[in-house]
């Protein structure tokens, strides 16, 4: 029996304290991991078989066939890489250059805009270690880490004691949830759960900005002004605040302008940071690697040494336009993450 420490790639937390017992390359027991991590690691098997036309082949034949397809393609697409290593991502970028391919990942239809804003220094961010050691006000906005990242609250954001938070969550941390339903995370936040209607995030942000500015907050859905004023007072007192932004927030907004306005006034009144609730364990890595190479986090097209960027180069728009004649999918499953009407193309 072999026992060692491993990094779990079940979500974006990348917990590095996982103990695993394995025998003959089969994982028998997983310790320390959450339910998501245990399921993720136990389903791990040996290397995938190589197939060409649904028939088993050796590795060399598979590589040769894939290379031939890409070489002969007029408009190839490389997609995925959110569950790939940095080294793989950098090689994929070089391959996209060589084949004049469109290159994109799942961030183009989820948290990509937020990550890009962080990399462009338009929003202030921090590390999970900073949050564990310093955070006193934590907001989960359109996010439910109790289900999506089960060790988030216990290991990083709310329950643990940190170097500057020795008294723990009972006395030194305030957790707030803003969401359309009472999630498991919202239940932990207790009275600091602010339930808004679907699509109501922009109005709530405007009302919160008004409250932070000393004005009476108003919403068309009649959210109690007293509760918004109470929230504003908590935020103004934050010494190290953080907003964990999830898909529930991003999908409600037409653009990031309300987020920019909120973060601006929060940092005039207090000290606030924003962290995207990334699901795939290395989506952020792909965004950073592509940004370092091209200045963009996704939706790029390489063409004769030039880089083009725009919504038309997203995986969704490329497939809808039916211009892709070959696709290399790496570490992703477009059939599960894209609408059937798009992925079938």
Stretch-by-stretch model annotation:
Residues 200-204, 208, 212-310:
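Active-site phosphate/pyrophosphate-binding segments
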Residues 77-80, 243, 328-329:
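Short catalytic-loop micro-motif centered on adjacent basic/acidic residues
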Residues 96-159, 259-345:
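Extended redox/cofactor-interaction regions of prokaryotic respiratory oxidoreductases
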Residues 174, 239-241, 326:
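A generic secondary-structure signal marking the coil-to-beta-strand transition
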Residues 83-84, 250-251, 334-335:
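Glycine-/small-residue-rich active-site loops that bind phosphorylated ligands and cofactors
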């Amino acid at each position: 029996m072999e026992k060692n420490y491993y990094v779990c790639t079940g979500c974006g937390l990348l917990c590095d304290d996982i103990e695993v017992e394995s025998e003959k390359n089969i994982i028998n027991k997983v310790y320390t991991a959450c339910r998501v991590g245990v399921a993720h690691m136990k389903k791990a098997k040996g290397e995938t078989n190589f197939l060409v036309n649904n028939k088993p082949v050796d590795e060399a034949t598979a590589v040769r066939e894939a290379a031939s397809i890409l070489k002969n393609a007029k408009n190839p697409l490389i997609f995925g890489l959110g569950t790939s290593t940095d080294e793989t991502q950098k090689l994929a970028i070089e391959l996209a250059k060589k084949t004049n391919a469109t290159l994109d990942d799942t961030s183009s239809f989820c948290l990509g805009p937020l990550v890009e804003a962080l990399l462009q220094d338009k929003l202030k961010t921090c590390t999970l270690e900073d949050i564990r050691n310093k955070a006193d006000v934590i907001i989960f906005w359109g996010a439910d880490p109790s289900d999506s990242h089960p060790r988030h609250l216990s290991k990083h954001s709310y329950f643990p004691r940190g170097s500057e938070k020795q008294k723990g969550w009972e006395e030194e941390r305030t957790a707030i949830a803003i969401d359309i339903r009472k999630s498991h995370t919202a239940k932990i936040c207790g009275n600091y759960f602010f339930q808004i209607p679907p699509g109501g995030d922009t109005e709530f942000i405007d009302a919160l900005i008004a409250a932070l500015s000393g004005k009476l907050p108003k919403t068309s859905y009649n959210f109690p002004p007293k509760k918004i004023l109470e929230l504003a007072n908590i935020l103004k007192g934050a010494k190290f605040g953080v907003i964990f932004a999830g898909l529930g927030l991003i999908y409600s907004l037409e653009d990031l302008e309300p987020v920019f306005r909120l973060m601006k006034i929060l940092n005039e009144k207090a000290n606030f940071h924003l962290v995207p609730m990334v699901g795939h364990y290395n989506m952020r890595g792909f965004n950073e690697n592509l940004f370092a190479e091209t200045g963009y986090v996704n939706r790029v097209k390489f063409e004769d040494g030039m880089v083009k960027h725009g919504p038309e180069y997203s995986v969704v728009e490329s497939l809808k336009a039916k211009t892709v004649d070959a696709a290399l999918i790496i570490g992703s499953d477009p059939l599960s993450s894209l609408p059937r009407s798009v992925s079938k193309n």
